[in-house]
């Protein structure tokens, strides 16, 4: 830690306080995340240190770079590249009655998918994607923060400040208690973020797990074994759930064209193996008119 100096506290993340800092000798500005773990007394579990150290290998223009993992008095500090704005703050800053430029929505979504596909290829899930951990710069680049941290530290029910972790972007298989889930959970979250990019409003803003599920069901229909094999045997599925018909997605997301709505619907398919993958989503006709050569990952994709 002696290599870094804290400049100011910039926020409270899922796992602890986040500071803006500077590397003393290079002057590089960084984000310093102090990780608070439930089992504080025993110090940091070695498995968490191992897991998180692997994340230093994730090097992609749309993934916030983990620069260093440091221990100080049984506290873990993660040193990340610094970006000053997150997507939630940006969406909140757009004046009432105005919306994000449709081409920027498209560019941001494509870049998010680039970052997700890169991590999924490396068997790393996010599990907690939301506008607060999508960071942007002033050049139109968006980057995913906190990729892989859920595996190292778990996804807490409450932030260490006792604020409840948001459920708005959580996939239905997670909400229904599925013990096994995989990469489609991140695609679902990205779909809900896609809708929010277009409308500035969260698509499903539940205030409890059951309210969250019911908001999804009202919009997309209550799932059963016909549309999602074995959903009725998931731990938190109840045969007493109201049977909504759904079919109201397009009326809730007015600012998307036909291709955008088609892609969104494919990202929000209930049955996880049938849900579009990040890689498949990137080839969807919605992106046909996006100039991919200007995107930050173009150089590594050979566009």
UniProtKB/Swiss-Prot annotation:
Domain Protein kinase: 4-287
Protein's cellular compartments: Nucleus; Cytoplasm, Cytoskeleton, Microtubule organizing center, Centrosome
One Pfam family cited in the UniProt record for this chain: Pkinase
The name this protein goes by in its record: Cyclin-dependent kinase 1
Protein family: Belongs to the protein kinase superfamily. CMGC Ser/Thr protein kinase family. CDC2/CDKX subfamily.
Primary localisation category: nucleus
Originating organism: Oryzias curvinotus
Phosphotyrosine PTM sites in chain numbering: 15
Cystine residue pairs: none
Purpose: Plays a key role in the control of the eukaryotic cell cycle by modulating the centrosome cycle as well as mitotic onset; promotes G2-M transition via association with multiple interphase cyclins. During G2 and early mitosis, CDC25A/B/C-mediated dephosphorylation activates CDK1/cyclin complexes which phosphorylate several substrates that trigger at least centrosome separation, Golgi dynamics, nuclear envelope breakdown and chromosome condensation.
Catalytic machinery residues: 128 (proton acceptor)
GO BP term, pick one: mitotic G2 DNA damage checkpoint signaling
Name of the coding gene: cdk1
Entry EC no(s): 2.7.11.22, 2.7.11.23
């Amino acid at each position: 830690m002696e290599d870094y100096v804290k400049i100011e506290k910039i926020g409270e993340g899922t796992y602890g306080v986040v500071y803006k800092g500077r590397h003393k000798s290079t002057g590089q500005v960084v984000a310093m995340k102090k990780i608070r773990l439930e089992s504080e007394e025993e110090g940091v579990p070695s498995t968490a240190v191992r897991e998180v150290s692997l994340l230093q290998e994730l090097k992609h223009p749309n993934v916030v770079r983990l620069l260093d993992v440091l221990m100080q008095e049984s506290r873990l500090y993660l040193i990340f590249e610094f970006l000053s704005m997150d997507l939630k703050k940006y969406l909140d800053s757009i004046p009432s009655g105005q919306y994000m430029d449709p081409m920027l929505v498209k560019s941001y979504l494509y870049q998010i998918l680039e970052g997700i596909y890169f991590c999924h290829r490396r068997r790393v899930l996010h599990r907690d994607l939301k506008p607060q951990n999508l960071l942007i710069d002033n050049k139109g680049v968006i980057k995913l923060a906190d990729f892989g941290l859920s595996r190292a530290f778990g996804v807490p029910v409450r932030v260490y400040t006792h604020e409840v972790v948001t459920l708005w972007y959580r996939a239905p298989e997670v909400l229904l208690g599925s013990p096994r889930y995989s990469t489609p959970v991140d695609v679902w979250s990205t779909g809900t973020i896609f809708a929010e990019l277009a409308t500035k409003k969260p698509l499903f803003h539940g205030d409890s797990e059951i309210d969250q599920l019911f908001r999804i069901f009202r919009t997309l229909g209550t799932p059963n074994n016909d549309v999602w094999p074995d959903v009725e045997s998931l731990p938190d599925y109840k045969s007493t759930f109201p049977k909504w018909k759904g079919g109201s997605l397009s009326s809730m997301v007015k600012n998307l064209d036909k291709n955008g709505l088609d892609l969104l619907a494919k990202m929000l398919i209930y049955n996880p193996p049938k849900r579009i993958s990040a890689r498949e989503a990137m080839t969807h006709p919605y992106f046909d008119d996006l100039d991919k050569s200007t995107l930050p990952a173009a150089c590594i994709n050979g566009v």
